[in-house]
A protein has these predicted regions:
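Bacterial N-terminal signal peptides that target proteins for export
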Residues: 1-10
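Bacterial N-terminal signal peptides
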Residues: 9-20
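Pepsin/retropepsin-fold aspartyl endopeptidases
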Residues: 21-328
Length: 328
């Protein structure tokens, strides 16, 4: 009998869950909401499970509603192994995928195919990563899985953390009618400022470049992180004071690490200046090893829900833009 061929793909899942964190305020609608509705986009409500401040939503896998974490820090969409069997995903036994938690430990997963529906948008033959069963609590173990960048691109979804929604092309939108691709391109009318994102080299993860105290810094934009985290390896070079906390970071493999806290001043992204920004600090060696900006520099950290909420940000991962502030 011919032995199956196993393909190993490597990716880093930067999805983070933090314990003992404060509450995150949720913004309202406004001009952006009205413009998206006028464009024919429909809103998909998101929610939060008990004990977790991050956003998740119910999406259909082969017609079955499952609750997924919305995680732009993951390049792939995964689903629990038991639920993959229950929903009838077609398993590809020739593929094995190796992923890593943000702290570096490897996770071996499989591949399965089935339909994924977010709102009225359907990807009929979507490639899911099959997450193995395990007894260790991870950053996604309370969910059926996580919706990553591949699903956001496949459905044309925009992530609106401040209002707790996703937006997808509706049946009467230009995209829904098949008159244009799912990528919007730049739309200055969706925010006060439009910040261009780049990818992390060969990886699809989204990088936002800026400066801190006049020095270049770059960050992974991660809707699956409760709070923003700066790599200790980078932070310590700025000689900024910090203090220890009782909070711990839990990554996708279940590993935990204590956090420090600091306050940053003069964090700038293009024309957007953030005069004061609170940040958590943790060693992020694996993240810096695999994620580099366009100049080849290792990334300096992860921008999470706190940054997106405070900045009233809308993420268009497919087009590579982050819209900051309500449009005028």
């Amino acid at each position: 009998m011919r032995r199956p061929f196993f393909h190993f793909a490597s990716a880093l899942l930067a999805c983070l869950f933090l314990t003992q964190c404060g509450s995150i305020p949720v913004g309202g609608g406004g001009a952006r909401t009205k413009r998206l509705e006028k464009m024919g986009y429909e809103s998909v409500p998101l929610g939060k499970i008990a004990g977790d401040k991050r956003y998740s939503g119910f999406f259909l896998v082969n017609g079955t509603p499952l609750q997924f974490l919305v995680d732009s820090g993951a390049n792939r969409t995964d689903v629990d192994e038991a639920l993959a069997e229950k929903t009838g995903l077609r398993i590809d036994h020739s593929v094995r995928i190796v992923t890593r938690g943000a702290l570096g430990r490897e996770i071996h997963s499989g591949r399965g195919f089935g339909s994924l529906q977010i709102g009225s948008m359907i990807s009929p033959d979507f490639p899911f990563t099959i997450a193995p069963r395990g007894g260790v609590k991870t950053s996604t173990s309370s969910y059926a899985g996580q919706v990553g960048l591949d699903a956001l691109s496949a459905t044309g979804a925009l992530v609106d953390i401040p209002t707790g929604k996703m937006w997808v092309p509706g049946p009467n939108s230009t995209q829904g009618l098949g008159r244009a691709g799912l990528r919007l391109g730049v739309r200055p009318d969706l925010g006060n400022k439009a910040l261009r994102l780049e990818t992390a080299g060969r990886l699809p993860h989204l990088i936002l470049k800026g400066t801190l105290n006049g020095r270049p810094v770059s960050w992974v934009v991660d809707t699956g992180a409760e709070v923003s985290v700066m790599a200790a390896e980078s932070f310590d070079s700025f000689n900024i004071p910090s203090r220890n906390t009782n909070s711990r970071m839990i990554d996708a493999s279940g590993d935990r690490i204590p956090l420090r806290h600091a306050r940053l001043y003069n964090l700038t992204f293009g024309e957007v200046n953030i005069s004061v920004f609170d940040i958590s600090i943790a060693p992020l060696g694996p993240v810096r090893k695999y994620f580099h900006d366009g100049s080849g520099r290792p990334v300096d950290g992860i921008l999470g829900m706190d940054f997106l909420t405070t900045g009233s940000a809308l993420l268009d991962s497919g087009s590579g833009f982050l819209y900051m502030g309500e449009p005028r």
